Amino acid sequence: MRHFKYTKDEAEEAIDQIVHDEKHRAILRRRYHDKALLEPLAEEFGIEPRTVSDIIAKYRADLEGFIKWRRNHQESFY
């Protein structure tokens, strides 16, 4: 599986548009912006690393899908 490439701005916009839970939003921002690892994130937010992994997995496809959609439709706006 290839790693999906995105900019920090793309990740920020996708997170803001898709994720409504503030705690999940904060975790995803730290993960996608700072490339934070699971254990430090779990410690920072007082949850288990498995829970952090589940949160990331829950939103990954939606975030990547939003970024791809945005890229495809950005051209039509200009």
Predicted segments, located by residue:
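Short, Lys/Arg-enriched anionic-surface-contact patches
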Residues: H3-K23
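Short amphipathic alpha helix immediately N-terminal
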Residues: V19-D34
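Short alpha-helical "recognition helix" segments of helix-turn-helix
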Residues: P40-F45
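C-terminal flanking helix
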Residues: R60-R71
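Short acidic DE-rich linear segments
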Residues: R70-Y78
